[in-house]
Structures are given as C-alpha cells and as structure tokens.
Amino acid sequence: MTRRAPRWAAAADAACLVAFVLIGRTSHDLHGGAGWFVAVLWPFAVGWLAAALVTRLYVAGSHPWWRAAATVVLGVTVALVLRATLTTRATPVIFGVVAVSFLALTTLGWRLVVAALSRRRASVAA
C-alpha cells in the first residue's frame, strides 16, 4: 500500500513556483497585475503538475530525492515548451538554466531542511 505525502509538500512546492515568478518580476523590474502573474506562472504550474504525476512525486516510496530532481528538470522542460509554443514570451536557454537552478535549490532545499529536522527529532526521541 502506498502512502501519500503530506499535502503541505505540494503547497511548499507551489510556494517555490510562486516565489520564482515574483522574484523574476522584481529582478527584471516588471510591472503588471494579476494577469501578468498568471501568464507567467501557468506554464510552470502545468509543467510541475504534469512532471509530478509522471514521477509520482507526492506518493511515498523509494528514491524521493531522485523523483524530486526529475520533477524539477521535467517540469521546467514542459513549462518552457508550453511557454514557447502557446505564448508570445521568449524562452532563452539561460532562462531555463535559471529556472532549473532556482527550483532545484528551493524545492530540494526545503526537503533537505525537513529531513534534517526529522532526523534530529528522531535522535532526540531515542
């Protein structure tokens, strides 16, 4: 029987995607309302969801780190293809590198912190 990961895991990943879009907006001094935000976010949200389903990211099992890393690479790849084909936004290679780097650092980073805290709690309890 498989066990599902806590819902907060998906929420934490979604927060990483939102942070990516908001930091990009600030870094490039872009202005726009909710429409702009959604226009930039949707390819990444769809890409992440598709990749998470393929990699079974939110189903407990073996190799969670590899599944998370694969989700980052596959999710950004899908997002860039969607962005290039269904929007008028440019998709330079460096954008993909930045997206993979940021999302790897944040989504794998919060998992690393949670794992370290879990180990610490387990050692204190023992």
Name what the model sees in each region.
Residues 19-28, 46, 50-58, 78-82, ...:
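Alpha-helical membrane-inserting segments
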Residues 2-37:
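Membrane-helix boundary elements
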Residues 18, 43, 70-81, 102:
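Small-residue-rich segments of transmembrane alpha-helices in multi-pass membrane proteins
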Residues 34-46, 96:
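Structural signature of hydrophobic alpha-helical transmembrane segments
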Residues 8-9, 104-126:
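Membrane-water interface at the C-terminal end of transmembrane alpha helices
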Residues 82-98:
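Membrane-helix boundary connector in multi-pass membrane proteins
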Residues 56-74, 93-100:
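Internal alpha-helical transmembrane segments of multi-pass membrane proteins
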Residues 30-32, 61-62, 88-90:
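Membrane-interface helix caps and helix-loop-helix hairpins in membrane proteins
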